[in-house]
Every structure is written in C-alpha cells, then in structure tokens.
Swiss-Prot record:
Listed InterPro entries: Goosecoid-like_HB, HD, Homeobox_CS, Homeodomain-like_sf
Biased composition (Basic and acidic residues): 241-257
Lineage, opening ranks: Eukaryota, Metazoa, Chordata, Craniata, Vertebrata
Protein name: Homeobox protein goosecoid
Gene3D superfamilies given in the database record: Homeodomain-like (1.10.10.60)
Organism: Saguinus labiatus
Length: 257
C-alpha cells in the first residue's frame, strides 16, 4: 500500500467538506408556509368575487414573478413572506452533515386537538395552529425559533374552549324550582328532571354544581354585608358627641317625671 494514501492531504480530502455538502438555499428563499383548504375560497378573498371576512384588511399576496399564488398543494394553500393564518405546516430548513454541528430536524409537533393536513406528516415539519388574525401582520415564521414554534403549539393544545350550554327559560325555571326544594338532588331526581326538560343528566349535574357555588358566594357576601353593617352601627354609636348624650339623658329624665 503506497504511503501517499496516508498523507495529510489525502486524509483531509476524504472527509466531506461542509460548504459542499450543505444543500444550496437561495438568500431570499424562506420556509414555505402551507394553509389549510378554505372550502373553495382563497385566504384573501373568494374566487367568485365576493370578499371573505379578511379580504378587506389584508391584500392579496403577489409572487416575485408577478402572479399571485393560489394553487392548492396537497389539499392546502401556500402563502408568501412567511405570514400565515390558521393551521399551517412550516417545513424545516435543510440540514448539513454532522460535521457542521447542525441542529437535527425538528420532529412533527402534533397533538390530538390539531388535525394534520394530508401529505405533510413528515418528520421535517412543525405544526403551528391556530394564530389569531390580529397577529397576522406581526408574525413571521422565518424569524421564529424552534422553541417558539413548540410553545405556540403547546399553548394551543393546552387551551381548549369548552362548549357552553344555553338553557331556555323553561329549563331554567324547572332547574331553579328543584334547587329551591333541595340543593343536592340524587341521581334519580336529576334523571327525571333531565327527561322532563330534554337535557342530559350530566348537564343537570353541572348546573347544580354551578348553582350551589353561586348560592354559597351569595350567602357569604350577605353575611359579610350584615357584619359590616353591625360594625358600622357600633362605631357610629360610640362616636356620638357628649352633648347628644346629655340631651338624650335629659329627655329620659323628663319622660320619667
């Protein structure tokens, strides 16, 4: 085996160079942003001429070539300049080899409450959903770090809006009448009332829990008001002037005589 194969130049030449191995990326290229399908309407306005909810506030994006990008990709729409609204996937940037010390691609940050658009379930994407439209002019996906994207997704998964039941007047009247009879109805009574007012027994149970909490708050506030009134009467009587006390004493003597 020739000794030239073990020279410094040959050994260094066999190692991959970072500048040559990193995928080329244009300076102006940004991470693509994918919008969900909007049921026939684009993000910035309806195709039929009628403007959408936000069509009057946000102008249509214009591509560098002069044509707006409205084509659907994998059932989703793309937006320019990294500005986004709603559910989207941010594709991870190309990563170099291990010799460059590059950060490995971020795995898909998904949760059960956020659906994943088809075709973008790969490990090189980050799911961020949703973002309020008030933040649209100020949010830039390209400037967000990996930790910020994870926090956005965790915030959405943690805060899940509950469905609020709206009771009718007849239902509220029946519930209130039973509450005046008993504060803690049993399961049979709750089921009977639920069938009567066309509600689920769980809804009746939750209503009674909230009503008892309200009743305790009202009871506590009324007791505090009565205590404050008694304290005020005591302090006002103790601060009476001596002249007033003498007049009251004279009036008592005159009444006795």
């Amino acid at each position: 085996m020739p000794a030239s194969m073990f020279s410094i130049d040959n050994i260094l030449a066999a190692r991959p160079r970072c500048k040559d191995s990193v995928l080329p990326v244009a300076p102006s290229a940004a991470a693509p942003v994918v919008f969900p399908a909007l049921h026939g309407d684009s993000l910035y306005g309806a195709s039929g001429g009628a403007s959408s909810d936000y069509g009057a506030f946000y102008p249509r994006p214009v591509a560098p070539g002069g044509a707006g990008l409205q084509a659907a990709v994998g059932g989703s729409r793309l937006g320019y300049n990294n500005y986004f609204y709603g559910q989207l996937h941010v594709q991870a940037a190309p990563v170099g080899p291990a010799c460059c010390g590059a950060v490995p691609p971020l795995g898909a940050q998904q949760c059960s409450c956020v659906p994943t658009p088809p075709g973008y379930e790969g490990p090189g994407s980050v799911l961020v959903s949703p973002v309020p439209h008030q933040m649209l002019p100020y949010m830039n996906v390209g400037t967000l770090s990996r930790t910020e994207l994870q926090l956005l997704n965790q915030l959405h998964c943690r805060r899940k809006r509950r469905h609020r039941t709206i009771f009718t007047d007849e239902q509220l009247e029946a519930l209130e009448n039973l509450f005046q009879e008993t504060k803690y109805p049993d399961v049979g009574t709750r089921e009977q009332l639920a069938r009567k007012v066309h509600l689920r027994e769980e809804k009746v149970e939750v209503w009674f829990k909230n009503r008892r909490a309200k009743w305790r708050r009202q009871k506590r506030s009324s007791s505090e008001e009565s205590e404050n009134a008694e304290k005020w009467n005591k302090t006002s009587s103790s601060k009476a002037s001596p002249e007033k006390r003498e007049e009251e004493g004279k009036s008592d003597l005159d009444s006795d005589s």
